[in-house]
């Protein structure tokens, strides 16, 4: 028989009422906030108007790989398999007391769209738009403003000594409503830009 989990091991997901309370306190910020997007224990986010693709066919983790950004046309844009697309949420968010997780909506998953490769978790203190690492199993037409994912908020056990927005080493603190390319190169020291 398994022993009961200690309180520190139990992950608590915020309910709709707890999310609203946190928004009223200012510990969670969602802009624009639309009440109809609040689920039972999540908040729906939407695809912003921009996509980007990497300019080079082979990426280098030690370098700042250039991207080409474009606006999604009104008639939509067809994503194709084998290509990584960087998207962005239409919503700006802040999370000061909870750990935010971004997950795809089931309707999006049923179209074969993945909205993040590995980066679904945010940090306490993350204050920005969410860049999406999008890929598809089949060609699929997407549209700016379509529901793309949902934010889930977890309680944190203990005081956070270094929130993301106050860390000098945080790589994604510059607020931008545009897709942001990988900053992995900063882990290797000084930026090594492609020539």
Annotate each PLM feature.
Residues 2, 6-195:
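DUTPase catalytic domain/fold
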